[in-house]
Amino acid sequence: MGAIFTNIAEIFAKSGWAQIFFTEGGWKYAVMLAVACVLLYLAIVKQFEPLLLLPIGFGMLMTNLPLDGIFHMDIFINETNHIDWALLGSSGGMVDYIYLGVKLGIYPPLIFLGIGTMTDFEPLIARPSSLLLGAAAQLGIFFTFVGAKILGFTNKEAASIGIIGGADGPTAIFVTTRLAPHLLGSIAVAAYCYMALVPVIQPPIMKALTTEKERQIVMTAPRRVSKTEKILFPIIVTIIVALTLPDAAILVGCLMMGNLMKESGVVERITKTAGNELMNIITIFLGFSVGCTTNAATFLNIQTVEIIVLGIVAFGVGTAGGVLLGKVMCLVTHGKINPLIGSAGVSAVPMAARVSQKEGQRADPGNFLLMHAMGPNVAGVIGSAVAAGVFIALFG
């Protein structure tokens, strides 16, 4: 009988339960499992960015279970700062190979390709001044960069943290894998959580910075945009951005290629593939592999707390920057621009534009701002990619 109990004790000692609850530092893994469950709750029950939070949350769950070698961070982050191909070949598993798409910067541009097939740039083409609102909303990126520097982060780390303010998860991942891959888990989780919380974060700032009269402004319908303009737009933008800022060319180029495929109407089959099947597959790979980087040993530290705080500051300042420029444009145009559309300059598409619409209708139920807000919203996508290119050019 004693031998049976001894065997049971040995089995328990080798189990994951013992590693979590009876080893030094095991509590960290329990905390991370709780965080993973919170992300899954937000994705499934609250439906906050479920397409990303669900795979990220499950990846976080898997990597913080006491399993042997689901993900080997030392393959990608080591003294040489290069992928250890020999170690990958000898010890790499499925997640390691999937993560190559993140490390090599493959997934974010492909996500942009898919986004391009679903994006309508007509509101931006019809009202080019929307570009200014999209640019103003990137203020949060550079403000947070300065804040991160003050807190002691390096230039590369500060740039990666700052890009959270663009409200663009793929761009944040793209920049972080280039500049500060050791912060990828924290930055990705912060970026996507705050993207999901745009309807919660933005309204108080929008109300605080605008008057009731400004929120009630009804904007005139934008002009009609010809098909020729829609086709020329992605081509011209790609040329200008690529020649001006080569480091942003891959993101902006893929975005514009996807849009050109859509607007040309001559490659309907691959347009649907890029916007549906390819986009869905890449989303699964990206979310799950990024979630697997959030191991308790590297995630639970003071840096993560600072990143989360800086991230919400970035969102707040970006929203405020867009609204304040919207107020200036309202003044200059003698009340023809509703300042609420400025908050849509962050590139959370289309959530930020929907928030502008909702706040406008609260002030005036007959006010429809969605199409007007989509201009700054899609301009913000371009703006965040350009900001990413600036950081990579400076610190890459």
Segments the model singles out, each with a brief description of its role:
Residues 104, 112-118, 133-143, 147, ...:
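Alpha-helical membrane segments and immediately flanking helix-loop junctions
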Residues 1-77, 90:
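N-terminal alpha-helical transmembrane segments of multi-pass membrane transport
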Residues 39, 99-125, 258-261, 279-301:
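Hydrophobic transmembrane alpha-helices of secondary-active transporters
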Residues 20-32, 83, 96-111, 155-165, ...:
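Structural signature of hydrophobic alpha-helical transmembrane segments
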Residues 182-200, 310-318, 341-344:
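Alpha-helical transmembrane segments
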Residues 193-266:
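Membrane-embedded hairpin module used as a gating/binding unit in multi-pass transport
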Residues 238-322:
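Transmembrane helical segments that form the transport core of multi-pass membrane transport proteins
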